Amino acid sequence: MHEVTGYTISAMPHLQKLRGTENVNGKNIYSDKSVARKITLKSPTVKGDYSYGSVYGPYLDTAHLAQVRSVVQSFKLNYIRKGMSDYDKVLTAFNYLRSNCRYAYRGWQYNYANTAWGALVYGEAQCSGYARAMKALCDAIGVDCRYVHANAKASNPSHQWNQVKVGGKWYILDAQSNGFLLGTNTWIKQAGMSWDTKGLPTCSKT
């Protein structure tokens, strides 16, 4: 089982039947991987913005951001291999996030569900938490990624997702709704999304 030291990550009872057990500072958390690996993260060094006000959670304190960083580094060490293409890296991060987080039906205001902490540490998030978590994972594995918020013209003005760069092109990625590498035409047609594109890279249309 994994051994991660340096930060405390609480157990999520609702995940017990879905994942194998791993020990974190004497507490059990759950993972979809059963491969035995030992990881010590006393001082996580994975790349990303873990300062206060980060896109990973603008109001998360340094302790919560440190927990996010610990999980992100564990993901990178366990799942990302030398020589992987950006496509494989993004697909791995996408599947990891969808396997280790479920939708927070109670609302965004519970358990930091609109942050990367909710998605990666607590295991529950709404769309904003999924998007912020995906941004953190992509930053760590060296894949260009943007965090995007819908505008008032969208079918759901509160919705949030990502844009990722794969193979020299930008695509829409929405881990919460299982949208993987979509073109803008597909995204607009299927989800009715609208967003301000100023400052964002131009995505593939198909």
Identify the role of each PLM range.
Residues 64-119:
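Secondary-structure boundary elements
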Residues 1-74, 143:
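Linear, non-domain "peripheral" regions
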Residues 195-205:
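Short, low-complexity, Pro/Ser/Thr/Gly-rich segments in the mature regions of secreted, periplasmic
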Residues 1, 63, 122-125, 149:
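Alpha-helix capping and helix-loop boundary segments enriched in small/acidic/polar residues
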Residues 129-194:
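Hydrophobic/aromatic-rich core segments of domains that either
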Residues 89-93, 123-138:
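Active-site nucleophilic cysteine motif
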